[in-house]
Amino acid sequence: MQASLEDEWLWGWDATPGIVSVWAERTGRAVVWRRAAGSDTLTREEDRFRPWLLLPALDDLTHLGARLLPEEAPGAELFDSVAWRELTGAGQFRYLVSASDSRTLEAAVLAGASARLKRQITRLADLGDEAALSLPPEEQYLVATGRTYFGGLAFDDLHRLQFDLETTGLNPAQHSIFLVAVRDNRGFSAVLDVAERGLDGPAAEADLIRRLVALIRQRDPDVIENHNLHGFDLPFLARRAELLGVTLALGRIGGGLRRRPASRGYGPWRGAEADASERDEARGRYTVAGRELIDTLDAVRRYDFAARDLPGHGLKAVARHFGLASPDREYVAGAQVYQTWLVDPARVRHYALDDVNEADGVARLLGGAAFALARMAPRRYERLADAGPATGVLDPLLVRAYLRAGAALPARSVSDGVQHSGASLYLFAAGVATRVVKADVSSLYPSLMRQYRIGPASDRLGALLALVDRLVEQRLAAKRRARAAPPGSRERHTDEALSAAMK
């Protein structure tokens, strides 16, 4: 395989620099924001793409008649036409179908499937994983164009803003926001509270939320961050805004916050007593046009998965561990913050600013992992930050590789029923061990895959092994850099986080 093609599989092929956010819509409209390296110059570009799906056959589209056309045929680009291209090889997903609007495309597939199955099908997901492969609009755009985020940018080139809510309690249906601390990496900081404008009750809180929205729009960051952002701040803010009738127009275009699914989640009201709707709420994440919403708790968990040296995952514990806490850091017990505010508001303002300063510090130390992955994978930065290594990173890379090669994608594999015991474990001695020396094989399983060329039987392109080769090389290089860097340095933590992300 030519090295240049393998490079395209890993890095994409469109080297457009400085992409800091992509927002794509089902209509085929894509908006791309780009930042010039080393400056605050931001540009917005609009682009068009054809929303697409992967199907195993065209059976559910034949009812379109003359509106179903090979993509090279005259008229295939028309609004009401569906274009198709047959991919090479014997993979499950052999047909790439596209239309000018994803609603047109999905409606056509669902109509055909409903007629074939003699029951009403309203969602592609109801057809099962083997019937269609669909990606979110932004990923469709990035896969089709070969673009990725952050080309030519350093992490500090991003305009990053942190905000932290202080609330009267943890339940947004019963409690309220009384203070918000805000800072960014351009030297700005502020504390907003309900007392400073002479308003009372719900009117004061609604005014506070409106001022927060206006401030974020005025500062115009590429990235919004906090610790437990998706687990507390955003769901609490969204619920309070809904109850107060305030629009959270936090994006660069369009409306307010939108929810997106995530494989894992956390929130202050989850637990054994939570009902199904509350658990779904905890698993959800948020997204907004033109800005990436990053939860530093994800970076902490990813780092500790490999390092296993953190005393806890809470912001204060992590900040102390990494030496980010300032000497005059203000600490207030969570349950006492509101009561402290009533008698000593200056102390709570100090405390809240310390929180956002530490969230920024954690992001700078550990954010390099997701930042590096976003240069490779055709996925929004915010989704890579909370994704696992398999479905989160490798899956979009493999989809892009196969489509770039014009090859049919293999089916999702199912178990062959064979029981596997996993790695071997032996006990050679019992008792208290002294003078222990650790023996470790770096990237053991990927190294075995590389050495013996072990890969999925269905991966006829060898794309997974090619990607693993490149990723392992980068991971081992990051580990070497981390070991060579001074203990506790930003460089060391960044490379450790990058190594963990590629594990």
Model-inferred region functions:
Residues L170-N171, A190-V191, P235, R302-D304, ...:
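Short helix/loop capping segments that flank catalytic or ligand/cofactor-binding pockets
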Residues P136, A439-K503:
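Conserved catalytic core of nucleic-acid polymerases
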Residues Q2-E6, A335-S443, S447-R450, S489-K503:
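Common nucleic-acid-contacting/processivity interface regions adjacent to the catalytic cores
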Residues Q2-E71, P136-P137, Y141, R147-E225, ...:
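Conserved RNase H-like, two-metal-ion catalytic cores of nucleic-acid enzymes
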Residues G28-R34, R147, N228-L229, F322-R329, ...:
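Core structural elements
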Residues A190-L192, G198-A203, D220, I224, ...:
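Active-site-proximal helix-loop-helix substrate-binding element of RNase H-like nuclease domains
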Residues I177-L179, P235-T247, P311, A377-R380, ...:
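Short secondary-structure boundary/capping segments
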Residues L124-L158, A411-F428, T434:
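A contiguous, basic/glycine-rich beta-loop/short-helix subdomain that forms a polymer-engagement track
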